[in-house]
Amino acid sequence: MAAETASGYIQHHLQNLTYGQLPDGSWGFAHSAAEAKAMGFWAFHLDTLGWSVALGLIFLLIFRMAAKKATSGQPGGLQNFVEVMVDFVNGSVKDSFHGRSPVIAPLALTIFVWVFLMNAVDLVPVDWIPQLAILISGDPHIPFRAVSTTDPNATLAMAFCVFALIIFYSIKVKGLGGFIGELTLHPFGSKNIFVQILLIPVNFLLEFVTLIAKPISLALRLFGNMYAGELVFILIAVMFGSGLLWLSGLGVVLQWAWAVFHILIITLQAFIFMMLTIVYLSMAHEDNH
């Protein structure tokens, strides 16, 4: 594979199916990174939106089926699987969440399974889904990315939803005054009222940075790990197009080895996202700083 072809192949697989306003004023799909960039902020990554919604519906369908078929007698395979998942997540919540809220465990379960499903799409060979999109659309140049968590828009959206819950529960539990005091009266304090007033800007700067870092680090951690994993799969796929038998053979070995290792990564990243969400919401429920 020539360097230009390999470079184009990689860029094509790292570009989202973007819909927005083209430079000529019409609306349509971007066929290059330059066109996608020219669309500006109001552009939609339809592949990210479509796959995230579809996998969310699959999650709901599977768990609904398990709930409808649940029995107190001999459980089936699906019921066993769902019960194991629920017990695992419920145990994680009990160990890490010290407040009282009926929504934390269902939220944690939703996050873990949904993120895991979005991550798991990365195990599908990199050319299969893009080629299917080309076959359906009839456009040989249309890009398509199936792994929603390799799009920072998706991970940031999920993280800022968690951030909104952090703010909501902080104000609900501590009150608006308590929340503002948490941001302005810590970590530095003084019994002298004038010194305390002088410390408010410093405290606010430190606490605000700490607060806003939570969703950003939550999003970028998931995005960075999944993006790197996808890039490795793409680079391995380039080996298959090299035309060299030994390099293609090495690609087969690396593909299987990385896929097996990646199963651990996709599970671990879903678990980390879930656990950090639980910990952050637990901190929001604490009365004291």
UniProtKB/Swiss-Prot annotation:
HAMAP family linked to this entry: ATP_synth_a_bact
Protein keywords: ATP synthesis, Cell inner membrane, Cell membrane, CF(0), Hydrogen ion transport, Ion transport, Membrane, Transmembrane, Transmembrane helix, Transport
GO molecular function: proton-transporting ATP synthase activity, rotational mechanism
Compartment(s): Cell inner membrane
Entries under PANTHER family matching the protein: ATP SYNTHASE SUBUNIT A, CHLOROPLASTIC
Pfam families according to UniProt: ATP-synt_A
NCBIfam families named among the record's database cross-references: ATP_synt_6_or_A, PRK05815.1-1
Transmembrane helix keyword on record: yes
Main localization of the protein described in the UniProt heading: membrane
InterPro entries listed in its UniProt record: ATP_syn_F0_a_bact/chloroplast, ATP_synth_F0_asu, ATP_synth_F0_asu_AS, F0_ATP_A_sf
GO terms for cellular component: plasma membrane; proton-transporting ATP synthase complex
Protein name from the UniProt record: ATP synthase subunit a
GO biological processes: proton motive force-driven plasma membrane ATP synthesis
Organism classification: Bacteria, Pseudomonadati, Pseudomonadota, Gammaproteobacteria, Pseudomonadales
Keyword Membrane part of the UniProt annotation: yes
Membrane-topology descriptor: Multi-pass membrane protein
Known partners and oligomeric status: F-type ATPases have 2 components, CF(1) - the catalytic core - and CF(0) - the membrane proton channel. CF(1) has five subunits: alpha(3), beta(3), gamma(1), delta(1), epsilon(1). CF(0) has three main subunits: a(1), b(2) and c(9-12). The alpha and beta chains form an alternating ring which encloses part of the gamma chain. CF(1) is attached to CF(0) by a central stalk formed by the gamma and epsilon chains, while a peripheral stalk is formed by the delta and b chains.
Record-linked SUPFAM superfamilies: F1F0 ATP synthase subunit A
Highest taxon above the source species: Bacteria
Membrane-spanning segments: 43-63, 103-123, 160-180, 193-213, 232-252, 259-279
Family named by the database record: Belongs to the ATPase A chain family.
Gene this chain is encoded by: atpB
Described function: Key component of the proton channel; it plays a direct role in the translocation of protons across the membrane.
